[in-house]
Swiss-Prot record:
Location(s), subcellular: Cytoplasm
Organism field: Alteromonas mediterranea (strain DSM 17117 / CIP 110805 / LMG 28347 / Deep ecotype)
Entries under Pfam families matching the protein: DUF150_C (PF17384), RimP_N (PF02576)
Superkingdom classification of source: Bacteria
GO cellular component term, pick one: cytosol
Protein name: Ribosome maturation factor RimP
Length: 152
C-alpha cells in the first residue's frame, strides 16, 4: 500500500467504523487532472446505495478538514464487489480456497503477476498455487490483489 493510501486509511477508518462499516481499503488513482479516490466499504448485511452516500458524506467532511490531497479528485464510495480488492493480510486469510490475481511491487522469479488459488496465509505470507506450482508471496510485496469471480 502506498504512503498516501496508508495515511488516508488511518485518517478515514475511525469515521467509517463509527457509521458501522468496515473500511476494506482505499485506492488513489492519479489520472492527470481527474484523479479518483476510491473508498471500499463492507458490512455483514451488505452495502446499499444509501450506505455509500452516508459514508461519502462522512469521508468528505473528514477530507475537507484534514485536506490531505493537494490535487483535484473525485470521491467514489462502493462495496468491494465480486472482484473484491485485497488490501490486508486479513483479506487473504478470508480468501483461502478462492482464485486471486495479484501483482507484485518487486518481481519474484522474474514474475510480477500471479493468478491462482490461495492455499494459506499466515505470518505475512500468502501461499498461492499457480498451474500446479506453489508460490510464497509476501503480503507487503503485493501491489494489487483481487479475487477472481468464478461462476459455477
Amino acid at each position: 500500500m502506498a504512503k498516501l493510501e496508508e495515511k488516508l486509511t488511518e485518517m478515514l477508518e475511525p469515521g467509517v467504523e463509527a457509521l458501522g462499516f468496515e473500511l476494506v481499503g482505499i485506492e488513489f488513482v492519479r489520472a492527470g487532472k481527474h484523479s479518483i479516490l476510491r473508498v471500499f466499504i463492507d458490512h455483514e448485511n451488505g452495502i446499499t446505495v444509501d450506505d455509500c452516500a452516508d459514508v461519502s458524506h462522512q469521508v468528505s467532511a473528514i477530507l475537507d478538514v484534514e485536506d490531505p490531497i493537494s490535487t483535484e479528485y473525485n470521491l467514489e464510495v462502493s462495496s468491494p464487489g465480486m472482484d473484491r480488492p485485497l488490501f490486508k493480510e486479513k483479506h487473504y486469510i478470508e480468501s483461502v480456497g478462492e482464485v486471486v490475481q495479484v501483482r507484485l511491487s518487486m518481481p519474484m522469479d522474474d514474475r510480477r503477476n500471479f493468478k491462482g488459488k490461495v492455499l494459506a496465509c499466515e505470518n505475512g505470507m500468502v501461499s498461492i498455487e499457480v498451474d500446479g506450482q506453489q508460490f510464497q508471496l509476501a503480503v507487503a510485496n503485493i501491489e494489487k490483489g483481487n479475487v477472481v469471480p468464478t461462476f459455477d
